[in-house]
């Protein structure tokens, strides 16, 4: 079963929660993973809009509305429902290795372009992912008496047919020498969303092939 909703709209989220209530469906696990995250290839086409000097407040607002405000609203609504019946629950926020390290803008560089024209990872990505860490810690200490735990998973880059030069640049920064395979985070998600992690609360699990230790 699935429902479409706008995570940046509390009204939309409440509508879905009401539909679930009508069907006596309880949310036991909430995974916040919505984001506006441009692919590396698209950064090259949006140089003038991704660089900090040209980054618009409209884009800032729209990306934070989805990636950070959306996680707050979903946690507020669905976490609040979990807390009502004392059956506990789990909130998992999907952050990023860029929640603990700065983006290395060199991996996006293009030859024969002066610095002010080089594509970069947008500022919003780091701000949102770092913000999720703070949100998780807040939630972890807000409902513990209700049996609700909150943690983060911070994945590194996932290989998905990106530009070869980008893949090599990023892989050079990772001790394992490669990007993650698309299914390599399943085990961590299952762990964090199960009783196997019953004593874990307010933590950030970084799975980045070792990138953040260099």
Outline where the language-model segments fall.
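Short C-terminal tail/terminal secondary-structure segment
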Residues: 49, 113, 190, 201-214
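The beta1-alpha1 cofactor-binding region of Rossmann-like NAD(H)/NADP(H)-dependent oxidoreductases
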Residues: 4-15, 57, 182-184
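A conserved structural motif in NAD(P)-dependent oxidoreductases
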Residues: 174-185, 196
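Conserved NAD(P)H cofactor-binding loop of Rossmann-fold oxidoreductase domains
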Residues: 33-48, 210
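Active-site Tyr-X3-Lys motif and surrounding loop/helix of classical short-chain dehydrogenase/reductase
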Residues: 15-22, 41, 46-65
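Short, small/polar-rich loop/turn modules that mediate ligand/substrate recognition or access, typified
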Residues: 144-149, 200-202
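Catalytic loop of short-chain dehydrogenase/reductase
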Residues: 49-57, 83, 92-145
């Amino acid at each position: 079963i699935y429902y479409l909703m706008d995570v940046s709209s509390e009204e939309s989220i409440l509508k879905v929660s009401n539909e679930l209530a009508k069907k006596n469906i309880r949310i036991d696990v909430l995974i916040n993973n919505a984001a506006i995250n441009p692919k590396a290839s698209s950064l090259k086409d949006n140089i003038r809009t991704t660089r900090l000097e040209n980054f618009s407040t409209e884009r800032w607002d729209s990306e934070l509305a989805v990636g950070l405000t959306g996680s707050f609203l979903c946690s507020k609504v669905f976490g609040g429902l979990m807390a009502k019946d004392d059956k506990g629950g789990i909130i998992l926020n999907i952050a990023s290795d860029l929640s603990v390290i700065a983006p290395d803008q060199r991996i996006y560089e293009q030859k024969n372009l002066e610095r002010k024209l080089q594509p970069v990872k947008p500022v919003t990505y780091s701000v949102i992912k770092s913000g999720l860490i703070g949100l998780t810690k807040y939630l972890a200490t807000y409902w513990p008496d209700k049996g609700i735990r909150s943690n983060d998973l911070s994945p590194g880059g996932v290989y998905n047919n990106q530009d070869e030069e980008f893949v090599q640049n990023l892989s050079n920064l990772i001790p394992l020498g490669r990007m993650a395979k698309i299914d390599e985070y399943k085990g961590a998600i299952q762990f964090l969303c199960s009783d196997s992690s019953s004593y874990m609360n307010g933590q950030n699990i970084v799975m980045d092939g070792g990138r953040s230790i260099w």
